[in-house]
Amino acid sequence: MTAYLLHDELIFPHPEYADPDGLLAIGGDLSPDRLILAYKSGIFPWYNHKPILWWSPSKRPLIFPRLFKMSRSLYQTLKKDIYRVSFDKDFVTVIKGCATAPRKDSTGTWITEEMIEAYTLLHKLGFAHSVEVWFNDKIVGGLYGISIGRAFFGESMFTLMKDASKVAISCLVEHLILNNFYFIDCQITNKHLIRLGAYEIPRSVFLILLKEAVQKETLTNKWDRDFEFTSKTAKFLKEKLIPR
C-alpha cells in the first residue's frame, strides 16, 4: 500500500492502513499538535532524512509497569547505590546523549537536530520527560519519552556506564506504578526490550489499550523527582513487580 501524503491539515489515516513494515504516512511537520495527535493515534515519527516518515507497526512491544523484568544483576546494581537518578533536570543533555552515544547495532542516529528541537519544545510544554542517571556530577545514562494520559511512549535511552540505562528505566517504572500508568510503548521490538519484560501485542489490541490510557489526565507538570538511593527503588520493585 502507498503511504499517505500529509499536508498542512492535522490528520492521520487510520493505523490499520500502514504497509506491512508499518509505514503509514509521509510528510507533515513535527509541531507539538501533530506529534501529540500522532502518539494518541498509535503513530510515531522515525526517519533519518526528510521527508518525515510516520509509522504504526503491526505488532507493538509494550512494557506493563508491574510486569517489568528486574534481573538479579540489575537488582544488585540498584542495591549498591552507585548512581543518583533525577527526572526532568537536563532534558537536552539526555536527548543529545541518546543521539550521539555509540551503539553496537547502528552506525548513525535517527535523532536529528529537528527532532531535538521538536521534543525539547514538547518538554517545555510538559509532555516530554527525561530520566538522568548521574555518577558523581556527570550524566552517564538516561532516557526520554512522551507522556499522554496514562501512557508513556519511550523514545530512546543511552548508557555510558554499566547498567545506567537499566537503572533509568527502573526508576521510571517505579514512577509509572505510583501514578497508575498503563504501559510503556516501546514502538519497535528488540532483544534488549524483551529482556526488560516487553510483550509484543497486535496493533489492534494496542489501539484499544491506547484509547483508554490517553483519555486519563495527563501529568503535564515537571516530573521533579530525585532518587538519591536507588536501593529504595530496588526494594519497591521487588515488592510491587508481579513474578514472571
Swiss-Prot record:
GO terms for molecular function: leucyl-tRNA--protein transferase activity. One of its GO terms (cellular component) is cytoplasm. Keywords: Acyltransferase, Cytoplasm, Transferase. The keyword Cytoplasm applies. Belongs to the L/F-transferase family. HAMAP family: Leu_Phe_trans (MF_00688). This is Leucyl/phenylalanyl-tRNA--protein transferase.
